[in-house]
Protein backbone atom coordinates (compact mmCIF):
# COMPACT_ATOMS: atom_id res chain seq x y z
CA UNK A 1 0.00 0.00 0.00
CA UNK A 2 2.91 2.35 0.70
CA UNK A 3 4.24 1.58 -2.79
CA UNK A 4 0.86 2.44 -4.35
CA UNK A 5 0.76 5.65 -2.33
CA UNK A 6 4.21 6.70 -3.58
CA UNK A 7 3.34 5.74 -7.16
CA UNK A 8 0.18 7.85 -7.06
CA UNK A 9 2.08 10.83 -5.74
CA UNK A 10 4.60 10.56 -8.60
CA UNK A 11 1.80 11.25 -11.12
CA UNK A 12 0.27 14.70 -11.46
CA UNK A 13 -2.61 14.47 -13.91
CA UNK A 14 -3.76 17.68 -15.51
CA UNK A 15 -7.48 18.18 -14.90
CA UNK A 16 -9.49 18.71 -18.08
CA UNK A 17 -13.29 19.12 -17.88
CA UNK A 18 -13.57 17.67 -21.39
CA UNK A 19 -12.08 14.34 -20.31
CA UNK A 20 -13.77 11.50 -18.37
CA UNK A 21 -13.19 11.35 -14.61
CA UNK A 22 -10.99 8.30 -15.08
CA UNK A 23 -8.26 9.16 -17.55
CA UNK A 24 -5.48 6.82 -16.50
CA UNK A 25 -3.92 5.34 -13.40
CA UNK A 26 -4.25 2.18 -11.37
CA UNK A 27 -6.98 -0.38 -12.08
CA UNK A 28 -7.32 -3.54 -10.02
CA UNK A 29 -8.51 -4.83 -6.69
CA UNK A 30 -7.80 -5.21 -2.99
CA UNK A 31 -9.11 -8.53 -1.65
CA UNK A 32 -10.86 -8.76 1.72
CA UNK A 33 -7.73 -10.33 3.24
CA UNK A 34 -5.81 -7.07 2.74
CA UNK A 35 -7.30 -6.09 6.09
CA UNK A 36 -4.50 -8.20 7.62
CA UNK A 37 -1.97 -5.62 6.40
CA UNK A 38 -3.98 -2.79 7.96
CA UNK A 39 -5.26 -3.99 11.36
CA UNK A 40 -2.74 -5.50 13.79
CA UNK A 41 -5.44 -7.53 15.58
CA UNK A 42 -6.11 -9.44 12.35
CA UNK A 43 -2.52 -9.76 11.14
CA UNK A 44 -1.87 -13.22 12.55
CA UNK A 45 -5.12 -14.99 11.66
CA UNK A 46 -4.90 -16.79 8.35
CA UNK A 47 -8.00 -18.58 7.06
CA UNK A 48 -7.28 -21.08 4.26
CA UNK A 49 -6.77 -19.61 0.78
CA UNK A 50 -9.12 -21.72 -1.36
CA UNK A 51 -8.76 -19.90 -4.69
CA UNK A 52 -5.06 -19.00 -4.79
CA UNK A 53 -5.29 -15.43 -6.10
CA UNK A 54 -3.14 -12.48 -4.94
CA UNK A 55 -4.42 -10.33 -2.09
CA UNK A 56 -4.03 -7.28 -4.33
CA UNK A 57 -3.34 -6.81 -8.02
CA UNK A 58 -3.21 -3.58 -10.02
CA UNK A 59 -2.44 -2.55 -13.57
CA UNK A 60 -0.92 0.85 -14.34
CA UNK A 61 -3.11 2.09 -17.20
CA UNK A 62 -1.21 4.57 -19.35
CA UNK A 63 -3.23 3.91 -22.51
CA UNK A 64 -6.96 4.25 -21.91
CA UNK A 65 -10.04 3.99 -24.11
CA UNK A 66 -13.19 5.35 -22.46
CA UNK A 67 -16.53 4.87 -24.20
CA UNK A 68 -19.32 7.27 -23.21
CA UNK A 69 -22.56 5.35 -23.72
CA UNK A 70 -24.73 8.44 -23.29
CA UNK A 71 -22.89 10.53 -25.87
CA UNK A 72 -21.85 7.57 -28.04
CA UNK A 73 -18.32 8.95 -27.93
CA UNK A 74 -14.92 7.26 -27.55
CA UNK A 75 -12.05 8.99 -25.73
CA UNK A 76 -8.47 7.80 -26.32
CA UNK A 77 -6.06 8.94 -23.60
CA UNK A 78 -2.28 8.53 -23.26
CA UNK A 79 -0.37 9.34 -20.06
CA UNK A 80 3.02 10.94 -20.75
CA UNK A 81 5.30 13.68 -19.50
CA UNK A 82 3.56 16.75 -20.89
CA UNK A 83 6.82 18.68 -21.32
CA UNK A 84 9.01 16.12 -23.06
CA UNK A 85 6.87 13.43 -24.69
CA UNK A 86 4.12 15.23 -26.61
CA UNK A 87 5.22 13.92 -30.03
CA UNK A 88 5.54 10.38 -28.63
CA UNK A 89 2.02 10.66 -27.21
CA UNK A 90 0.62 11.65 -30.60
CA UNK A 91 2.35 8.67 -32.22
CA UNK A 92 0.92 6.31 -29.61
CA UNK A 93 -2.55 7.81 -30.08
CA UNK A 94 -2.30 7.23 -33.84
CA UNK A 95 -1.20 3.63 -33.26
CA UNK A 96 -4.05 3.04 -30.81
CA UNK A 97 -6.58 4.54 -33.21
CA UNK A 98 -5.28 2.37 -36.08
CA UNK A 99 -5.48 -0.71 -33.85
CA UNK A 100 -9.10 0.02 -32.95
CA UNK A 101 -9.99 0.36 -36.63
CA UNK A 102 -8.79 -3.16 -37.42
CA UNK A 103 -11.52 -5.80 -37.87
CA UNK A 104 -11.88 -8.21 -34.98
CA UNK A 105 -11.86 -11.99 -35.41
CA UNK A 106 -15.24 -13.57 -34.76
CA UNK A 107 -15.70 -14.62 -31.14
CA UNK A 108 -18.85 -16.12 -29.69
CA UNK A 109 -19.65 -14.18 -26.50
CA UNK A 110 -23.16 -15.59 -26.20
CA UNK A 111 -24.13 -17.05 -22.85
CA UNK A 112 -24.18 -20.84 -22.47
CA UNK A 113 -27.53 -22.46 -23.15
CA UNK A 114 -27.54 -25.02 -20.33
CA UNK A 115 -29.92 -24.50 -17.41
CA UNK A 116 -28.38 -23.99 -13.97
CA UNK A 117 -30.17 -24.65 -10.68
CA UNK A 118 -29.28 -23.71 -7.12
CA UNK A 119 -28.34 -27.32 -6.40
CA UNK A 120 -25.46 -27.04 -8.91
CA UNK A 121 -23.59 -24.57 -6.72
CA UNK A 122 -20.91 -25.85 -4.36
CA UNK A 123 -20.56 -24.21 -0.96
CA UNK A 124 -17.16 -23.83 0.64
CA UNK A 125 -18.87 -23.89 4.04
CA UNK A 126 -21.65 -26.48 4.12
CA UNK A 127 -25.23 -25.83 5.23
CA UNK A 128 -24.97 -27.20 8.76
CA UNK A 129 -21.65 -25.43 9.43
CA UNK A 130 -23.07 -22.16 8.09
CA UNK A 131 -26.17 -22.42 10.29
CA UNK A 132 -23.91 -23.12 13.27
CA UNK A 133 -21.86 -19.97 12.52
CA UNK A 134 -25.06 -17.89 12.38
CA UNK A 135 -26.21 -19.23 15.76
CA UNK A 136 -22.78 -18.50 17.24
CA UNK A 137 -22.90 -14.95 15.84
CA UNK A 138 -26.34 -14.46 17.45
CA UNK A 139 -24.85 -15.53 20.78
CA UNK A 140 -22.09 -12.93 20.45
CA UNK A 141 -24.75 -10.27 19.78
CA UNK A 142 -26.88 -11.36 22.75
CA UNK A 143 -23.81 -11.18 24.99
CA UNK A 144 -23.07 -7.64 23.82
CA UNK A 145 -19.80 -8.54 22.10
CA UNK A 146 -20.92 -7.07 18.76
CA UNK A 147 -23.97 -5.33 17.31
CA UNK A 148 -23.94 -7.03 13.92
CA UNK A 149 -21.77 -9.33 11.83
CA UNK A 150 -22.00 -10.38 8.19
CA UNK A 151 -21.83 -14.16 7.87
CA UNK A 152 -21.21 -15.27 4.31
CA UNK A 153 -20.01 -18.20 2.25
CA UNK A 154 -18.34 -18.68 -1.11
CA UNK A 155 -20.46 -20.44 -3.74
CA UNK A 156 -18.69 -21.95 -6.76
CA UNK A 157 -19.80 -23.43 -10.06
CA UNK A 158 -17.87 -24.78 -13.08
CA UNK A 159 -18.00 -22.20 -15.87
CA UNK A 160 -16.94 -22.91 -19.44
CA UNK A 161 -18.27 -19.86 -21.32
CA UNK A 162 -16.23 -16.75 -22.09
CA UNK A 163 -16.18 -14.41 -19.05
CA UNK A 164 -17.26 -11.58 -21.37
CA UNK A 165 -20.54 -13.47 -21.84
CA UNK A 166 -21.05 -13.46 -18.07
CA UNK A 167 -20.40 -9.72 -17.93
CA UNK A 168 -22.84 -9.06 -20.77
CA UNK A 169 -25.51 -11.16 -19.04
CA UNK A 170 -25.10 -9.17 -15.83
CA UNK A 171 -25.44 -5.90 -17.75
CA UNK A 172 -28.68 -7.14 -19.30
CA UNK A 173 -30.25 -8.85 -16.28
CA UNK A 174 -29.06 -6.81 -13.30
CA UNK A 175 -27.38 -3.52 -14.30
CA UNK A 176 -25.77 -1.59 -11.44
CA UNK A 177 -23.93 1.74 -11.13
CA UNK A 178 -20.58 -0.03 -10.69
CA UNK A 179 -19.82 -2.94 -13.02
CA UNK A 180 -16.46 -4.47 -13.79
CA UNK A 181 -14.71 -7.01 -15.98
CA UNK A 182 -10.99 -7.57 -15.41
CA UNK A 183 -8.97 -9.96 -17.58
CA UNK A 184 -5.96 -10.79 -15.42
CA UNK A 185 -4.70 -13.67 -17.62
CA UNK A 186 -4.69 -16.39 -14.93
CA UNK A 187 -8.19 -15.46 -13.79
CA UNK A 188 -11.01 -13.01 -14.46
CA UNK A 189 -13.06 -10.83 -12.12
CA UNK A 190 -16.63 -10.02 -13.17
CA UNK A 191 -19.20 -8.30 -11.01
CA UNK A 192 -21.55 -5.44 -10.25
CA UNK A 193 -22.47 -3.41 -7.20
CA UNK A 194 -24.63 -0.42 -6.27
CA UNK A 195 -22.12 0.61 -3.59
CA UNK A 196 -18.84 2.50 -3.39
CA UNK A 197 -16.35 1.85 -0.60
CA UNK A 198 -15.26 5.50 -0.51
CA UNK A 199 -14.63 8.36 -2.92
CA UNK A 200 -12.05 11.15 -2.72
CA UNK A 201 -12.55 14.09 -5.06
CA UNK A 202 -11.16 17.62 -4.59
CA UNK A 203 -10.43 16.86 -0.91
CA UNK A 204 -14.07 15.81 -0.37
CA UNK A 205 -14.58 12.33 1.08
CA UNK A 206 -17.82 10.44 0.42
CA UNK A 207 -19.06 7.13 1.79
CA UNK A 208 -22.57 5.83 1.09
CA UNK A 209 -23.78 3.18 3.55
CA UNK A 210 -26.32 0.80 2.01
CA UNK A 211 -28.43 -1.37 4.30
CA UNK A 212 -32.04 -2.36 3.85
CA UNK A 213 -33.30 -4.24 0.82
CA UNK A 214 -36.66 -5.14 -0.67
CA UNK A 215 -37.68 -6.64 -4.00
CA UNK A 216 -39.15 -4.38 -6.65
CA UNK A 217 -42.94 -4.42 -6.83
CA UNK A 218 -45.02 -5.97 -9.59
CA UNK A 219 -46.52 -2.52 -10.24
CA UNK A 220 -46.21 1.02 -8.85
CA UNK A 221 -48.59 0.35 -5.94
CA UNK A 222 -46.75 -2.82 -4.94
CA UNK A 223 -43.40 -1.02 -5.32
CA UNK A 224 -44.47 1.73 -2.90
CA UNK A 225 -45.77 -0.91 -0.49
CA UNK A 226 -42.36 -2.60 -0.52
CA UNK A 227 -40.69 0.75 0.18
CA UNK A 228 -42.99 1.45 3.15
CA UNK A 229 -42.40 -2.04 4.50
CA UNK A 230 -38.64 -1.42 4.42
CA UNK A 231 -38.60 2.08 5.94
CA UNK A 232 -40.93 0.97 8.76
CA UNK A 233 -38.99 -2.19 9.61
CA UNK A 234 -37.21 -1.67 12.99
CA UNK A 235 -34.54 -4.21 12.06
CA UNK A 236 -33.68 -2.41 8.80
CA UNK A 237 -33.59 1.00 10.51
CA UNK A 238 -31.40 -0.26 13.36
CA UNK A 239 -28.95 -1.90 10.96
CA UNK A 240 -28.81 1.19 8.77
CA UNK A 241 -28.20 3.53 11.71
CA UNK A 242 -25.29 1.35 12.87
CA UNK A 243 -23.72 1.54 9.41
CA UNK A 244 -24.15 5.32 9.28
CA UNK A 245 -22.35 5.59 12.62
CA UNK A 246 -19.65 3.20 11.40
CA UNK A 247 -19.20 5.34 8.28
CA UNK A 248 -18.93 8.50 10.40
CA UNK A 249 -16.34 6.86 12.66
CA UNK A 250 -14.27 5.52 9.73
CA UNK A 251 -14.24 8.86 7.91
CA UNK A 252 -13.55 10.72 11.15
CA UNK A 253 -10.16 9.00 11.37
CA UNK A 254 -8.83 10.94 8.36
CA UNK A 255 -11.13 14.00 8.26
CA UNK A 256 -10.59 17.59 9.28
CA UNK A 257 -12.16 18.07 12.74
CA UNK A 258 -15.77 19.16 12.51
CA UNK A 259 -16.09 18.39 8.78
CA UNK A 260 -17.97 15.06 8.99
CA UNK A 261 -21.67 15.34 8.22
CA UNK A 262 -24.55 13.13 7.09
CA UNK A 263 -25.87 14.85 3.96
CA UNK A 264 -28.55 12.25 3.12
CA UNK A 265 -30.37 9.85 5.41
CA UNK A 266 -32.64 6.89 4.60
CA UNK A 267 -32.83 7.66 0.87
CA UNK A 268 -34.29 5.04 -1.48
CA UNK A 269 -32.45 3.85 -4.59
CA UNK A 270 -34.27 1.60 -7.04
CA UNK A 271 -32.60 -0.93 -9.33
CA UNK A 272 -33.88 -3.52 -11.77
CA UNK A 273 -34.68 -6.23 -9.19
CA UNK A 274 -34.37 -4.60 -5.75
CA UNK A 275 -34.49 -1.30 -3.89
CA UNK A 276 -32.03 -0.23 -1.18
CA UNK A 277 -31.99 2.21 1.71
CA UNK A 278 -29.02 4.56 1.30
CA UNK A 279 -27.39 7.38 3.27
CA UNK A 280 -24.51 9.72 2.44
CA UNK A 281 -21.63 10.74 4.72
CA UNK A 282 -19.22 13.48 3.63
CA UNK A 283 -16.10 15.09 5.07
CA UNK A 284 -12.96 17.00 4.14
CA UNK A 285 -9.75 14.94 4.24
CA UNK A 286 -6.78 16.32 6.19
CA UNK A 287 -4.25 18.11 4.00
CA UNK A 288 -1.40 15.68 4.68
CA UNK A 289 -3.39 12.53 3.86
CA UNK A 290 -4.05 10.67 0.60
CA UNK A 291 -6.48 8.27 -1.06
CA UNK A 292 -4.59 5.31 0.41
CA UNK A 293 -5.08 6.75 3.90
CA UNK A 294 -8.81 6.96 3.14
CA UNK A 295 -8.74 3.35 1.96
CA UNK A 296 -7.02 2.18 5.15
CA UNK A 297 -9.60 4.02 7.27
CA UNK A 298 -12.70 2.67 5.52
CA UNK A 299 -11.73 -0.84 4.32
CA UNK A 300 -13.65 -3.09 4.24
CA UNK A 301 -17.18 -1.72 4.04
CA UNK A 302 -19.37 -2.32 7.06
CA UNK A 303 -21.83 -4.12 4.78
CA UNK A 304 -19.34 -7.01 4.40
CA UNK A 305 -17.99 -7.00 7.96
CA UNK A 306 -20.19 -5.68 10.78
CA UNK A 307 -19.99 -3.40 13.80
CA UNK A 308 -17.81 -2.83 15.71
CA UNK A 309 -15.83 -3.60 12.57
CA UNK A 310 -12.60 -5.10 13.94
CA UNK A 311 -14.33 -7.38 16.46
CA UNK A 312 -16.83 -8.45 13.78
CA UNK A 313 -13.97 -9.45 11.48
CA UNK A 314 -12.30 -11.42 14.27
CA UNK A 315 -15.55 -13.37 14.61
CA UNK A 316 -15.75 -13.87 10.83
CA UNK A 317 -12.23 -15.37 10.94
CA UNK A 318 -13.29 -17.60 13.82
Residue ranges of model-derived segments:
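Extended alpha-helical targeting/anchoring segments
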Residues: 1-318
Amino acid sequence: MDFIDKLQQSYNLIEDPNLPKFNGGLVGYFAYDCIRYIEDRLAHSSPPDTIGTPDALFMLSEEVAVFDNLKNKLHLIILVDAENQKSEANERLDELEDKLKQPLPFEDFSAPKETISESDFISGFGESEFKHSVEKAKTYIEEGDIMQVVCSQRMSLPFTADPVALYRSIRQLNPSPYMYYLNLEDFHIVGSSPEILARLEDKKVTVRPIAGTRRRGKDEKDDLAMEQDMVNDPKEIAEHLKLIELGRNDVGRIAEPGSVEVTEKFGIERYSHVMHMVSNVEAKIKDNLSAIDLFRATFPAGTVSGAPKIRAMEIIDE
